[in-house]
Design a protein with these regions (language model features):
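Generic structural signal for well-ordered alpha-helical scaffold segments
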Residues: 33-40, 118, 122-130, 151
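Phosphate-handling substructures
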Residues: 65-123
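Active-site signature of alpha/beta-hydrolase-fold catalytic machinery across serine-
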Residues: 61, 149-153
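Acidic, low-complexity terminal tails and accessory targeting/binding regions
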Residues: 68-72, 78-91, 130, 134-136, ...
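Short beta-strand scaffold positions
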Residues: 49-50, 119, 141-142
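Active-site-proximal alpha-helix that buttresses catalytic centers in soluble enzyme cores
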Residues: 2-72
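Short active-site segment of divalent metal-dependent hydrolases/proteases
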Residues: 11, 146-147
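Generic beta-sheet signal
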Residues: 3, 136-142
Length: 201
């Protein structure tokens, strides 16, 4: 089974009290517009998404291009889902330097129950792998923290947040018939390189 882990596109910022579930920004929608063509050569048979809007809105064009429905699985939600506000990672450095430093060192935010989060992510990936046929290609639309946890579990990295996972990046995994996972590519961004915030300075 082939599994694509796609991070959501650039979302709007939410304000305190609005929750951590914003829609995509205009820039994010431009990023998403490139995904169907970028993934066209792969025989995607199933599209699964986090319940958060920024992930669903990233998944929808890919599913529509194949006549598939977007399946929602709460377990693919990011660690921030219950927070009162969403702040894009690029802004955290200036607004919360202490939390930024913690994340830059590879740790989840201080408010996150790491064991519970890792267990949730591990369970949903195991479920996707065990319910898929060997020939299936599944595209999961999720979040940077979730994707890092998956890679951490497979590769045994020293830190949970070991990889930079860009907006609309594609991480590709393969699962053997026995369920053994291997990492093929991480954070593929060729299709949106020029639209990423870090490349527009």
């Amino acid at each position: 089974m082939q599994l694509f882990l796609v991070r959501h596109a650039l979302p709007l910022r939410s304000e305190p009290g609005q929750g951590a579930d914003p829609d995509l920004s205009e820039e994010g929608r431009a990023q998403v517009a490139r995904l169907p063509e970028a993934l066209a050569r792969f025989p995607i048979t199933r599209v699964v998404s986090s319940p958060q809007r920024r992930a669903i809105q990233t998944a929808e064009p890919v599913a529509a291009a194949r006549g598939l429905t977007v399946e929602i699985d709460d377990r693919f939600a990011e660690y921030d889902r219950d927070l009162p506000v969403y702040i894009p990672i690029e802004q955290i450095r200036d607004e919360n330097p202490q939390e930024w430093a913690r994340m830059a060192q590879g740790h989840l935010p201080s408010s996150v129950d790491e064991d519970a989060f890792r267990a949730r992510v591990r369970a949903v990936v195991d479920n996707v792998a065990t319910t898929a046929e060997h020939e299936d290609t599944v595209a999961v639309f999720s979040h940077g923290g979730v994707i890092n946890v998956v890679l951490h579990e497979i590769l045994g990295t020293r830190r949970v947040l070991s990889f930079p996972i860009d907006y609309v990046s594609v991480t590709r995994l393969l699962f053997s018939r026995s369920g053994q996972a291997s990492v093929v590519t991480v954070n593929g961004t060729e299709h949106v390189w020029d639209l990423l915030p870090r490349n527009q300075r």
